[in-house]
């Protein structure tokens, strides 16, 4: 059992040592973000705090008092802040 643990650790360390990290300059990073490759982190917009406050207020949580203002702020939160 100990032999297999040692073998697993040795293989993991060997595989980690073979990974080469190359630096990416800002131009390449921008091109990757525009092309959609990889995971993009969406920017958090300035209006998110206000829109979230409007969307999560009590009148927007109640189906009877939910209005167009609630819908607009909640749609903004879903599209731009989450």
Curated annotation (Swiss-Prot):
Compartments in which it is found: Secreted
GO CC terms, sorted: extracellular region
Signal sequence extent: 1-21
UniProt KW keywords: Disulfide bond, Neurotoxin, Secreted, Signal, Toxin
Domain of life: Eukaryota
Disulfide bonds: 48-70, 55-74, 60-81
Coiled coil start-end: none
Tissue expr: Expressed by the venom duct.
Propeptide stretch(es), residue numbers: 22-39
Molecular functions per Gene Ontology: toxin activity
Domain text: The cysteine framework is IX (C-C-C-C-C-C).
Name by which UniProt lists this protein: Turripeptide IX-04
């Amino acid at each position: 059992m100990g032999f297999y643990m040692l073998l697993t650790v040795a293989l993991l360390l060997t595989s980690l040592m073979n990974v080469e990290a190359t630096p990416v300059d800002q131009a390449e990073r921008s091109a990757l973000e525009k092309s959609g490759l990889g995971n993009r982190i969406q920017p958090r917009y300035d209006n998110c705090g206000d829109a979230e406050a409007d969307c999560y207020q009590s009148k927007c949580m109640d189906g009877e008092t939910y209005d167009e203002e609630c819908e607009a702020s909640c749609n903004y939160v879903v599209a731009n802040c989450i």
